[in-house]
Each structure stands twice: as C-alpha cells, then as structure tokens.
Amino acid sequence: MPILIGEATDVAFATRFRQEILGKSQNHFPRLQNLLEQAIRNPATCDLLSACKLFALFALGEAYSTRTCQAEENFPGIRYYISATRMLRVLCEEPKIDCVEIMVMLSIYSLAMNRRHSAYCIAGYALRFCIIIGLHLNVSPQQLPDRELREHRTRVWWSAYILDRSWASMLGKPISIQDEDIDVNMPSELQSLPPSDTASNDDFADTDNFSASIRLANLGAKITASLYSRRSHNTPFSSRVQQALQDLSHWLQGLPEPLRKCIEHVPPGSTMHAVTLHLYFNQCLILASRPILLHVLRLRRDSSMGTLEPGTESISASAIALSEACVECARRSYRVLSDSSINGSFPTFDYTYTQYLFSVAIVLAISSVLAECTTDGDDFETAAQILEQLDQNGSFAAKEFCRHIKATSNMLIQVHAEREQVGHGLAPALNDTMGHETELLVGPLLQDLLSQTELNLQFLEASAIDHGFQTFFWPEEQDDNCR
C-alpha cells in the first residue's frame, strides 16, 4: 500500500529510481475473511499485524453480539481489546493502512466502553495516520494501477473521516482536518468486477449508504462548530440555524430515491444502515434546534414566575416553530428506538443508540414541561426505563446517562408539584400533537421554516451560547467509565 513521501526528500528520489527500474505495481489487499481462515488453518502464518487486526475485530464482534454483562464479568471483548492495543503500540512506528483499520475498530470499541475521549483521540490519530500515508489525496491509475486497491484506500480514509467528524460533533470538539485539505474521491461501485468475484464485490458494497454517512457526518460536525463553538462568526445565530436546516434538507433530497424513502419512513425490517442514518439525521436536526427550545423554556418559565427582565422581546413564531420541530424529531427517534428495544434489535453496548435515546429523552422532558403533554411525559419515563435496563445489562454509557435521567426525573416531580400549587403551566403551550401523525423527516413544519428568507430569532442573539451558557468543567475525580 503506498505511503505518501515528500517529493523533496532523498527517500522519494530513491523510490522514484527503483520504480523506474522495477516497474512493479501492487495488487488488491487480501480480505479479512481470508485472513481469518488462514489464521485458523495455520496460526504460524499469522504475523503480528494480522493478529492485531483480528483481535480488534474479535473485540468489536463480542461487544456487539453480547446482550448482557453482569457487574462481576469483564466488559465483552476487553481481553481482545487489550491484546490489540498492546500490539498496536509496536506496530504504529511504521505507517501502514492496516494500522488505520485497527485504529478505526479500536475507536469504535472505546466508545462502546464509554471511553469517548479515548475514542475521539484514537479516531484523530487514525486520521493523522491517514495523512502520513497520503490517504487524504487521490492516487492516479499510473501510480497505482490496481483499481480495487485505490478504492480500498478511499474507503479506509472515509471510514476514519466519519469517526473523526462524528466523535467531534458528539463531544463538541474540533475536527482533525479541514475539508479544504482533502482531495479524495467519494466511494464508488466497481462495475467492472465480474459477478463471480463475490469477495471483492462484498468489500465494496453499500456505496450509497457509505456516501450518505460521509456527508451527514460532515454536516453534524459543521452544525456543532457553527452553533456551539466559541469561535467568532460573521453571521447572526439565526442565519446559522437556518443554514444548518437547509443543509440537512439538501442532504435528504440529494439521496437516491430508494434510500431516501427507506430513511424517511423506516419501514419494519429496515436495515441497520437505514435506521442509523434516520436516527443520525434526527439527531442533527435536534442539535440545530434545541438551543432555541431551551431558550423558549427559559423565557416561558421566567414569564410564568414574573421574573422576566423588562424589555425582553416576545418569542417569535419562528422560535415556536423551531421548538416544535425539535420535539417532533425527538418523538420520531423515540418511536424508532423504543421499537428496536421491543423487537430486540437495540445493540446493548452501542454508544450512539444509547446517546440518541438519552438526547430524545431530555427533549421529551422539556416538552412535557412546556406543553403539559402527558404523552411526552410518559415517553420520557419509558425512555428512562430502557436506559435503566441497559445500565443493568452492563452498558457504561447508560450508567452515566441514568444519573442525568434521575436528576431530570426529580426536577420534573418538583415542577409538577409547583404547577399543582399555582394551578397552571408555562402557557402558551407547544403543540402537543405535532409529530405524532407526521411520517416525513422534513414535514410541513420544517418545510415552512426552510421557505422563510430569514428566521426571526433576534430575542436569542444576545444570549446564545457565549452569554447564555456557561462552560462546563467536570470534576477530575469522576469514575473513568462515566466520562
């Protein structure tokens, strides 16, 4: 596999010389299944790099195939993870594309253990390894004649890219490389492969899903940087919110029709790819709109308690609509996640599904306070029960989220007690029926918001992020599993 060498170096000149003399090219990589079969037949032929890759794969396989783990038991796959990590320390001194593949798997596994900061660092390390190798740049057919090998380079790069963008968005951290520095083609189908070549065809399947995941991960990172970072912006907050919604709408409309329909409706029996894209899309919409929802809650509560500052602008129709859209997205994701919990397809140790469930639970809790909607309150309680069950099954992520859920539940009890004394809620209420009958991801509510030339969120400009939200610093003595 080619490694990027600076053309000005003596090593590059020597390499050019050997290429001219030998004129040799490389062939496509061996598939992982072949590597596993070879290791089973003859373990002596399995070198350190191959063993490390297999151990990383075994760790992921055990984590995602296990349904429950008791407190006295080791986390599923931890033995393989430790072995792979130790081997990788030796292998990392020499850049290889196999090392990037191993890092990608170890990053996903670290996240499953709720070591999300380690996962973020490993994903960033994988992306920097890609840059050292030169995977962020296209390789011409003259440099690498094997088309399958070129496609493999492309897919390894974008796999690391997705993790870097996704983890950065999840943690609110910077990305590792700017898009302007990337010159790589999107994944493509290798139509020239014969149908009998099932091994290579399987390697390069799901191109539409892969490309959609790349673009959505990029949008998620952009939304986080645009709305939640403390960098200086030349555009008002309302314009950045509207741009985020428009970008998400364009992403959805740009999907191939079969994939778009599957993601919009998520019919029974949908693939894991479609369900995950559906949930990720909803999460991006929630990210773009929940600052408005939280600020609407703050103004409503101040108004009901008579503590609203003089001169505060009234809440605009755009803000109300965005708040309703946020709740609508949460309800939609809740239905998908609760159904997956019922039918047994909810992966116990997958961090992202657990995080999505926690995210929508908080939005439903806010909706129950704003709208006095008993349905959203009941759904919040059900989501809390699912998280508690995941915690009992050994999910470290659910264990941490349950602490926040319990604190939220106690707060809701206090709010309801105050309402009984006062005799009213935070009027005017949000539309508590919105979203229950809507099937499309971008329904009439969001379409109306997207059609507006400018959202009226001026009441939020002075208090958005920089002034209204203080920076959080968690105590260092927290349990490592709950960071």
Q: What do the predicted segments below correspond to?
A:
Residues 1-23, 57, 145-214, 374, ...:
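Intrinsically disordered, low-complexity regulatory regions with latent secondary structure
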Residues 30-41, 185-192:
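Compositionally biased, low-complexity linear motifs
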Residues 2-6, 11-12, 31, 70-74, ...:
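Short, polar loop/linker segments at the starts of domains and inter-domain junctions
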Residues 259:
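Substrate-access "cap/lid" subdomains that shape
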Residues 35-56, 62-181, 201-254, 264-382:
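Extended, leucine-rich alpha-helical cores of fungal transcription factors
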Residues 25-27:
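Short helix-interrupting loop/turn segments at helix-coil junctions
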